[in-house]
C-alpha cells in the first residue's frame, strides 16, 4: 500500500490534511492516474438529469467525457433505462398519470358544457401504463442518442471507487472495467426508503420505483406517507377511479407552507381520497386470496386496527444512492445522519477534483431542474472559465396533486421565523376559476397568498398558489421574485383576463386586515 497526502478543503473554507492509502496493485489504476495517463477529462457517475446535463455540457466544451450508470432493480424487480428518477419513475410518468386523472374530471364536467357523454366512463390502466411506459422508453433512447452524438462514452455498469481518480465496474459479460478521470462528478440521485422494520414491508410493498411500471391496475391501494410523492400518487390513483387511502403518521408536506398543505388535504379528502391520520403500520401480510392485510396503530387512541388492500405503496422519503460507491476509497465525506455527500458552494466534496450534484447532496432541494442547472454551472466553472455559482434561493416548485400547489420563496411560517410576525404582511384571496362555474365545481380550496415584508417597498418573500395549472402560474412569477419584485410592482402588473394567474396581481386584502378575502364578481 502506498500512502499519499491529499489536501482537502473543508466546507468552512479551511484546509485540512488526510493521509489516504491507495492500493497501487489494482491493475495499475492508481499508478496510471498518478502518471497523468487518465482516460477522461470528466467522468460522470450517474445517468440522471443532472449527470447527463454535466456530460453534455462538458462535451460541448470539447472535453473527453464518460458517463457510468446502472439501475439496481427495485425489491419487486422493476428496472428501467437511462435518464434517472425524473424520466423513469418520477416527474415524467407522474405528470402523465396526473393528466390522465385530470381528464377524468373533465369528462365529468363535459355534460355541463353540452357534450353528451355516456356514463360511467371506465378507465383502462393497461392502456394508460403502456402509453406512459412507451414514452419513457423513447426518452431513454433519446438520451443514448444524444450522448452518442456528442461523443460521450456511456458505460452501463455499477461503478465503485478504487481511488480518488478511478472507478471500477463489471460489464454484462463479466468483464471488469476501470475508468480514470481528472475530474469526477457524482450524480447518483436517490431511491425510495423502505420501512424495513415493518414485517412484510419489503416482500409485499411497492414504491414510486414500481407504480408507474405496473402492467395491471394496483386496485385498492394504501399509500403510506405524507410526502409530496405520497399525495401525488394517491391523487392520480383516486382520480382514475381507484379506492385509495393515505396513512400518515405526522404532518403532510413537511417543509411546505402548512396552511396550503392543509388545503391540499382538504381538497383530496372531499374528492374521494381517504386519510388515516396519526397512524403507523406495523405489519403487512398476504392473505390466501392474494390481498394484503395491513395492521396499524392509531397514536390518538393507542388501539390497533387492520385493513385489506390490493397494493401497499411506501412513500416515506428517499435515501441517497451512495451505498455501493465505496466513497471512503476516494476520501469523500458524507453526512453521518443522512449519508448524503457534503459539498461546498462550488459543489466540491472533501476531495478537490470530485464533485457532487442533485439529490445525492446534503442540503440541496431534490428537484430535477436544480440538478440540471447546478451541473451545467459546475461544468462551465471547470472547463468554460466561468465563476458563476448555483443560487439555491427562491426555487419554484409544484406539487401535482389533483388541485395543484405551486410555490416559490418562503412559506408564511419561514417568513415569520426569519423576520418576525410584525414585519411580515400576507395578502391573500379565495377565488373561483371561470372553468369551475359552468361545471358547478367546488372551489373552496382555490386560494392564493403572497408573503411580503411589511416595510416599504414590501419585498415579495414568497408566493403560494393552489388551483388549476399551478405550475404554469408559478413559473412566471418566480422570475419576478428572483429579480427582487416588490408588492407594489406586482400590483402594477396588468393581468391577463380571464385567467387564474391574474388573481395574483389582484391581491389587495391582507390577513392582518381581517377582511373577507373571497373574490366576488368578475371583470372588476
Swiss-Prot record:
Cystine bridges: 86-91
Record PTM N6-succinyllysine, positions in chain: 175, 329
Keywords per UniProt: Disease variant, Disulfide bond, FAD, Flavoprotein, Mitochondrion, NADP, Oxidoreductase, Redox-active center, Selenocysteine, Transit peptide
NCBIfam families the UniProt entry points to: TGR (TIGR01438)
GO cellular-component term (any): cytosol
Chief location: mitochondrion
Ligand binding (FAD): 41-70
EC numbers on record: 1.8.1.9
Active site: 497 (proton acceptor)
InterPro entries: FAD/NAD-bd_sf, FAD/NAD-binding_dom, FAD/NAD-linked_Rdtase_dimer_sf, GSHR/TRXR-like, Pyr_nuc-diS_OxRdtase, Pyr_nucl-diS_OxRdtase_dimer, Pyr_OxRdtase_I_AS, Thioredoxin/glutathione_Rdtase
Cofactors demanded by this protein: FAD
Taxonomic path: Eukaryota, Metazoa, Chordata, Craniata, Vertebrata
The protein's name: Thioredoxin reductase 2, mitochondrial
Subunit and interaction comment: Homodimer.
A single GO BP: response to hyperoxia
